[in-house]
Design a protein with these regions (language model features):
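PLP-dependent amino-acid enzyme catalytic core
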Residues: 1-154
Length: 154
Protein backbone atom coordinates (compact mmCIF):
# COMPACT_ATOMS: atom_id res chain seq x y z
CA UNK A 1 0.00 0.00 0.00
CA UNK A 2 1.52 3.30 -1.03
CA UNK A 3 1.25 6.27 1.33
CA UNK A 4 1.74 9.15 -1.10
CA UNK A 5 0.37 11.99 1.06
CA UNK A 6 2.52 11.03 4.03
CA UNK A 7 5.51 10.62 1.73
CA UNK A 8 5.00 14.13 0.36
CA UNK A 9 4.60 15.67 3.83
CA UNK A 10 7.78 14.00 5.09
CA UNK A 11 9.73 14.59 1.86
CA UNK A 12 10.54 10.89 1.48
CA UNK A 13 10.99 9.16 -1.86
CA UNK A 14 8.62 6.32 -0.91
CA UNK A 15 6.62 5.02 2.03
CA UNK A 16 4.81 1.69 1.89
CA UNK A 17 2.58 -0.10 4.37
CA UNK A 18 2.23 -3.88 4.41
CA UNK A 19 -1.05 -5.10 5.90
CA UNK A 20 -0.52 -8.46 7.61
CA UNK A 21 -3.95 -8.62 9.26
CA UNK A 22 -5.41 -11.08 6.74
CA UNK A 23 -2.57 -13.62 6.71
CA UNK A 24 -3.89 -17.00 7.88
CA UNK A 25 -7.00 -15.15 9.14
CA UNK A 26 -5.07 -14.31 12.32
CA UNK A 27 -5.69 -10.54 12.32
CA UNK A 28 -2.12 -10.12 13.56
CA UNK A 29 1.15 -8.65 12.40
CA UNK A 30 2.90 -11.61 14.09
CA UNK A 31 1.23 -14.32 12.01
CA UNK A 32 4.40 -15.77 10.51
CA UNK A 33 6.81 -15.98 13.45
CA UNK A 34 5.32 -18.45 15.92
CA UNK A 35 3.76 -20.66 13.27
CA UNK A 36 7.08 -20.90 11.42
CA UNK A 37 8.92 -21.86 14.62
CA UNK A 38 6.30 -24.51 15.45
CA UNK A 39 6.66 -26.05 12.01
CA UNK A 40 10.46 -26.15 12.16
CA UNK A 41 10.78 -27.64 15.66
CA UNK A 42 8.02 -30.22 15.28
CA UNK A 43 9.23 -32.05 12.17
CA UNK A 44 8.73 -35.77 12.78
CA UNK A 45 7.36 -35.26 16.30
CA UNK A 46 3.66 -36.10 16.06
CA UNK A 47 3.01 -36.20 19.81
CA UNK A 48 4.73 -32.93 20.68
CA UNK A 49 2.78 -30.53 22.88
CA UNK A 50 3.51 -26.88 22.14
CA UNK A 51 3.33 -24.23 24.86
CA UNK A 52 3.74 -20.48 24.93
CA UNK A 53 3.00 -17.41 27.04
CA UNK A 54 1.47 -14.45 25.28
CA UNK A 55 -0.56 -11.28 25.51
CA UNK A 56 -2.29 -12.23 22.26
CA UNK A 57 -0.60 -11.97 18.86
CA UNK A 58 2.26 -14.44 19.27
CA UNK A 59 -0.08 -16.94 20.91
CA UNK A 60 -2.47 -16.85 17.96
CA UNK A 61 0.37 -17.62 15.58
CA UNK A 62 1.65 -20.49 17.75
CA UNK A 63 -1.88 -21.90 18.15
CA UNK A 64 -2.51 -21.67 14.40
CA UNK A 65 0.79 -23.41 13.63
CA UNK A 66 0.05 -26.20 16.11
CA UNK A 67 -3.47 -26.71 14.76
CA UNK A 68 -2.16 -26.88 11.20
CA UNK A 69 0.16 -29.71 12.27
CA UNK A 70 -2.40 -31.47 14.51
CA UNK A 71 -0.36 -30.79 17.64
CA UNK A 72 -1.75 -30.06 21.08
CA UNK A 73 -1.14 -26.52 22.23
CA UNK A 74 -1.20 -24.84 25.64
CA UNK A 75 -1.20 -21.04 25.67
CA UNK A 76 -0.64 -19.20 28.94
CA UNK A 77 -2.08 -15.71 29.37
CA UNK A 78 -2.27 -13.22 32.18
CA UNK A 79 -5.56 -12.69 33.96
CA UNK A 80 -5.58 -9.25 32.31
CA UNK A 81 -5.74 -10.55 28.74
CA UNK A 82 -9.16 -9.80 27.28
CA UNK A 83 -11.70 -12.53 26.65
CA UNK A 84 -11.70 -11.48 22.99
CA UNK A 85 -8.00 -12.31 22.70
CA UNK A 86 -8.52 -15.58 24.57
CA UNK A 87 -11.29 -16.52 22.12
CA UNK A 88 -9.06 -15.65 19.14
CA UNK A 89 -6.49 -18.15 20.44
CA UNK A 90 -9.01 -20.83 21.41
CA UNK A 91 -10.60 -20.87 17.97
CA UNK A 92 -7.38 -22.45 16.70
CA UNK A 93 -7.78 -25.36 19.10
CA UNK A 94 -5.37 -24.28 21.82
CA UNK A 95 -6.11 -24.70 25.49
CA UNK A 96 -5.77 -21.27 27.07
CA UNK A 97 -4.56 -21.24 30.66
CA UNK A 98 -5.23 -18.01 32.56
CA UNK A 99 -2.61 -17.15 35.16
CA UNK A 100 -3.00 -14.78 38.09
CA UNK A 101 -0.80 -11.74 37.63
CA UNK A 102 0.91 -10.18 34.63
CA UNK A 103 2.66 -11.47 31.48
CA UNK A 104 5.81 -12.38 33.41
CA UNK A 105 3.72 -14.55 35.75
CA UNK A 106 2.15 -16.33 32.78
CA UNK A 107 5.62 -16.92 31.31
CA UNK A 108 6.92 -18.39 34.57
CA UNK A 109 3.90 -20.71 34.82
CA UNK A 110 4.39 -21.73 31.19
CA UNK A 111 8.03 -22.59 31.91
CA UNK A 112 7.16 -24.48 35.09
CA UNK A 113 4.40 -26.64 33.59
CA UNK A 114 6.29 -27.15 30.33
CA UNK A 115 9.29 -28.51 32.19
CA UNK A 116 7.09 -30.71 34.38
CA UNK A 117 5.12 -32.11 31.41
CA UNK A 118 7.86 -32.12 28.75
CA UNK A 119 6.06 -29.59 26.54
CA UNK A 120 7.98 -27.61 23.93
CA UNK A 121 8.00 -23.87 24.67
CA UNK A 122 7.79 -21.55 21.66
CA UNK A 123 8.56 -18.00 22.78
CA UNK A 124 9.62 -15.08 20.62
CA UNK A 125 11.96 -13.51 23.20
CA UNK A 126 15.46 -14.86 23.65
CA UNK A 127 17.34 -15.24 26.92
CA UNK A 128 20.89 -16.33 27.70
CA UNK A 129 20.02 -20.03 27.37
CA UNK A 130 17.05 -19.77 25.00
CA UNK A 131 17.99 -18.51 21.56
CA UNK A 132 17.20 -21.10 18.90
CA UNK A 133 13.39 -20.87 18.87
CA UNK A 134 13.32 -17.05 19.00
CA UNK A 135 15.72 -17.14 16.02
CA UNK A 136 13.26 -19.39 14.19
CA UNK A 137 10.50 -16.93 15.03
CA UNK A 138 12.54 -14.08 13.55
CA UNK A 139 13.25 -16.22 10.48
CA UNK A 140 9.48 -16.52 10.04
CA UNK A 141 9.17 -12.73 10.14
CA UNK A 142 11.90 -12.46 7.51
CA UNK A 143 9.46 -13.95 5.00
CA UNK A 144 7.68 -10.57 5.10
CA UNK A 145 10.93 -8.80 4.23
CA UNK A 146 11.39 -11.04 1.19
CA UNK A 147 7.81 -10.35 0.12
CA UNK A 148 8.24 -6.60 0.58
CA UNK A 149 11.40 -6.70 -1.49
CA UNK A 150 9.58 -8.46 -4.34
CA UNK A 151 6.48 -6.28 -4.08
CA UNK A 152 8.39 -2.99 -4.12
CA UNK A 153 11.26 -3.95 -6.44
CA UNK A 154 13.77 -3.07 -3.71
Amino acid sequence: LSLDKLRENLSFNNIFYKDESRRFHLKSFKALGGAYAVEKISKGKKNMVISSATAGNHGRSVAWGAKRLNLKCKIFVSQYVSQTRVHEIEKFGAEVIKVKGNYENSLEECKRLSKKNNWQIVQDVSTKNYKYIPQLTMAGYSIMIKEISKQTDH
